[in-house]
Structure formats: structure tokens, C-alpha cells
Amino acid sequence: INKPGGSGGEALTYVKGKSGDQHTIMITLNSFFTTPQNQTELGINILDDYTPLARLLTDTFMVWIKKDGAKTSGINTLDDFLARAKQGDLVMGGTGKMSEDELLLGMMRGMFGFDAKYVPYSGGGAVAKGLIGGESDFTLNNPSEQMGFYQSGDSKALVMMTPKRNPAFPEVPSSYELGYPDLEYYMMR
């Protein structure tokens, strides 16, 4: 069962309601840690209400722009993006309020000295569509959410937030290659 919504709040509430059912398991994201803190009305205590079993994998994050966006046309590198971002009028689409997306934006603001408006969406697919639809100018997202738009040439990846390039995106430099080793992030699944 897929329970999208509320930065994982819907799934957390559903699984908590299944307490004692040994046939219910949840695969989640980093929002497992942040959502209960930001949505206290859910009444969830991750230490008392859940039993972690394993981390299945980690998913990388990338900086994505619309290839020919009104404010992003002509941006080809992370440095191009940062120069444009310092004008202070870009909009970033992300998944949920106070989610890892918004926290990553805060990290980038501090690292690079720019400001951007954050607009929360209901999920990663909606974030990707919002970028291509021109509702936002950039996003920090995992490859799977943007893959279709990337393959069609509608979106462009500027950097992989990892030490090394990803073989699936050989033309996208890593943050380490560009001299930004602190720009590293993995989403747990």
C-alpha cells in the first residue's frame, strides 16, 4: 500500500495504527525523523512507536533546473546557477514543509550565500511537474523523480551531491569534483 502525503505523516499514522500486526512493514525516507518533530499533532514518537529493521539503500540528490526555464535558460553549471541564485528571486519546489528538501535548501543558503523562496508540494512527482510547468525554478531531488523529464530533455542536472559521478549520469559532475565536498547528501530508504 502506498500512503503518500504529509512528508510521510500519512504513512507514519497508518503504520502506528497497525501496532501489533507483525505483517505490516514500512519503507520510508529521512522524513521518518523530521516529520514527527514538525507535525507534533500526529502524536508520533519514533523511538516508542516503531522498530527499525534495516536501511535498504541510500538515494543521491541532485540540483535540477528546467532546461529552458524563464529564469534558468543558459545555466549550464553549478557556478552559473549560484551566480543566478544570488539575485535572490528563484523559487525552489520541494516535498513538504520542513522536509529534507527545505533543510537542504537551508544548507545551500548557508554554504553559498543566496536566498530562494521555498514552495512545498505533496510529493516528489508533483515537485518534478512543478519544475517543468514553470511553478518553480529549481529543485533538489533524487534522480528517479526527475528521470522522465531528464530523458526528454526538459530538465537538466547540474551536480550530483556525492563524492563521485553516477554512471547513470556520466555528464553530471559530483560536488567533490567541483570543490564542494560539504555539498553531499543521501536520502535513506
Q: What label would you give each PLM region?
A:
Residues 18-27, 88-90, 114, 132-141, ...:
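Alpha-to-beta junction loops
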Residues 1-13:
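Early extracytoplasmic/lumenal segment of secretory-pathway proteins
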Residues 9-12, 127-128, 146:
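Short, hydrophobic alpha-helical packing/hinge segments within bilobed ligand-binding/sensory domains
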